[in-house]
Amino acid sequence: KPAEFRIGMIGSQHAGEASYCDFFPQWHHVSSGEQAVLLAADIRHAYFDRERAGDYDRLSQQLPQPVAQFLDVFRASETYATLSSEYAYIQDYRRSWARAPYPPTFVTVDSVVIHSGHILLVRRRSHPGKGLWALPGGFVDQDERIRDAAIRELREETRLKVPAPVLAGSIRSSRVFDHPHRSLRGRTITHAFLFELAPTGEGLPKVKGTDDADKAKWVPLFEFQRMEDQLFEDHFYVVNWFLGQV
């Protein structure tokens, strides 16, 4: 029986950017060009910016009724409150760099620490990613080398009771993750290191979340694979890249 209707995607794609429409290759894509009447970006910004509630109320009148109703219900949820707070933080963070002579590029480090089939994760204490699990890591100081920064941040955030020389000798691999849009904060290039700690017969080393982390814990790797929606930024994919090298 022939279909009584056809499904398609109508939208525009900005140069150099991935398109949402690309996620649905089974649907025919009709490029409409940029429409000045109603832009999804305008709706998103007004929806999450509490200071622009009036703008959202105006824009929402142009949405299909079921979509507007769904967004109104979602706006009363705890998840929306979290996202709105995160949005405000990101906007403030970007404004703080607005007067820089050039767009900033941030250099960070992350540590993938494996021990006896477990991975070491921390829970982020504050924005961005407040409450999400992440790899131990942070910004590189002006006067330190990349590897030293990774070891320092690892020990600061987890209180891992492993001497720095032992950690340095446990590095098995490293890689730079530099996708231009991997972080909402702005251009952030991270140097990630894989640490493989040898079993000692004393079980997993004790850890405790400190500094930017309110909790640190060892997570079984099989459990980690079910945590994609709980991980900060691209950390889930960073870990899985290294696991493919083990």
What is each PLM-predicted segment?
Residues 67-110:
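Acidic, metal-coordinating catalytic segment for phosphate/diphosphate chemistry
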Residues 121-124:
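Segments forming glycine/polar-rich beta-alpha architectures that bind adenosine-containing cofactors
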Residues 46-66:
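A polyampholytic, Gly/Pro-enriched intrinsically disordered region
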Residues 127-131:
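A conserved beta-turn-beta hairpin within the catalytic core of GNAT-like acetyltransferases
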Residues 27-52:
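Short, flexible loop segments at boundaries between secondary-structure elements
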Residues 1-28, 36:
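N-terminal Rossmann-like or analogous alpha/beta NTP/dinucleotide-binding catalytic cores
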Residues 139-243:
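Unchanged
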